[in-house]
């Protein structure tokens, strides 16, 4: 059970099953009630309490017997039973010991035990009665003998600290003269702390009862919380079924009240009465030695010691140990009730049920996750595994006495058994078998989804130009390095696995159609039929007058169709054809050898220069001084002005001459040609007569052909003279055997190949060096004149846009919606106003009703006391009889 409960404490970080304890390294809050933490078993969730009221009747009547001489008998008398030993081990850690002895080292234990015999100050013993010497001297000789005889055994088991810390014990008889202490009813009632590990309960009860019977001096001290009995306390029952192996090594403490002056006086008085001090069991000792220590304690509750009980003085001053504030603990409350075994079993069963429910919930979640997860395809290596082959040595064949193969060498294979044997292919990866429907015929046409099945799921459309540019610029993904986490991945799970069908959650769509009320423009079938029927009834046929031109001239309204001339094919004059023809001519003709032939020299060259014009004599240059200076140019200008003035002085009359009119050219005169349509007489009679004649001729020709087709004409018999017999069989001549020479043929082919290559090289050079200009045919062709468009002008007519119609409809809809919303708001406001008015009236009515109105004093009719009509009671003397009483007494 303990192991099961320990599983609840799992560390989420390190995933370790370990119990959780309080970290005492952290400074704790100083509190007098801090000891209550140790009164609760935090690992099991059960409080720790001890039943001190249980008393063993046998221990009460068992006196202290003298020690026999036999050491074996001494063990039987002194030692406890096996049950008592277990009691001592289990109760030892639960009974409080000195706070100093628990947390001190062994050397500290010795010093603390020796310091207990030191003298106490006189102030601490003022209110305590003197301890009688008889209480100390009444230690029997038998007890001293028992202590001396068990010296050897205890020395081996107890450490030095335990031996030194043991003090003198007192018997039950020596505590008879202890003064009785009056009990005061105070609240709260703190519990007294005792130091002995095993027999402190019994000794404490004996001391209190003996002291209360002899002494009657009143003291102002706090009474004990419970009435102690003289009997030996039985084994305390623990509420928790937890094992006590770990707790037996570290003794816990009982509840200890705060240290006050009264508590110090009571503790010093109890220590003076001879209460034994506690022995600290070292946690380093094994369990076997601890059990041995517990077994060596006497039934009366005294530990065996080598030294006899020392004589105590009248005033024993002890050094009181002080508990650190960190270690102040509170015990379980005295009113804590213990659970029975049945209740503990029921709690344990409930815990198991909770754990089972949690495990079932986890398993259900795990099963659900496994069920919904994608199946993992097995990973198969692309490379086949290495197949080991046996070594075959040539020397193995030499060991055989014969070379023939025996039946043992060959394995007998069952042919029939191997027919249906399945041999898996290791090269192909084995996946999950997917059932597919069987079809006798299948459509080869791929769908749009199947065409992109090879692409990834996130396929997006790309333009061809973008795809081509990315193909030339970007590096494909297959050439990019991948991380190790992606390289070591197995095959991806199948994406085409059908998903698990789930229930469709119906949801009401939030449609806005209920708020829209568009006019219905479409008419129904019945309305359409009624409309057509009405149109048919209203329709009246009215013939239009015939155009007289139709009756007079047949060709009216018929357009003359001008037949186009048939296309005349013109051959293409391609340059490549010319080149091919020239190439063929060059191949046939042999190259002419160029020979230099000198032409006769003309006689004019010898007579003189030919083609050179005569040299003209250049004129002599006339030197002129350049007019560099501006002054000279100004002088020349002034001289010219003076000459003009002189000339004007000579002319007495001033003559004004008009400037000539510039020649503006030939004036533009538009040449407008006025064409007039001159009506000419015309008639269609000739054309009609010609068409009738052609029609009659065609009809006669058709009749003649039909008559000719109806006439019977017999076909002549075939001429069978040329095919009178069986044709002769053509006999092919037999193949004539002729020798062949591979060497000559190969040499001839090589020679032809070399010639062919030389010709091709020569042609390439000639074609590369030759320049051929294309003929300038464009010089002799007519210039390009664009034709005028025959399309009619665009007819711009009125049109109605659908957006305008929809805008008008939308405007009407918005107006209707606004009016409807306005009506709703008005109605809502009216309802709210009515509601407010009703509420106001109700409040006013309640206020009016709540006003107290005193009721008027009612005046009733006065009560008339009428005399009674019954007669008065007439008193009569009763008739007493003694007969009944006499008969009852006699019987």
UniProtKB/Swiss-Prot annotation:
The keyword Disulfide bond does not apply. The keyword Secreted does not apply. Keywords: Cytoplasm, Cytoskeleton, Nucleus. Residues 236-246 have a biased composition (Basic residues). Residues 141-154 have a biased composition (Acidic residues). One of its GO terms (cellular component) is spindle. Residues 108-124, 155-173, 791-802 have a biased composition (Polar residues). PANTHER family: TARGETING PROTEIN FOR XKLP2. This is Targeting protein for Xklp2 homolog. It comes from Patiria pectinifera (Starfish). The lineage of its organism: Eukaryota, Metazoa, Echinodermata, Eleutherozoa, Asterozoa.
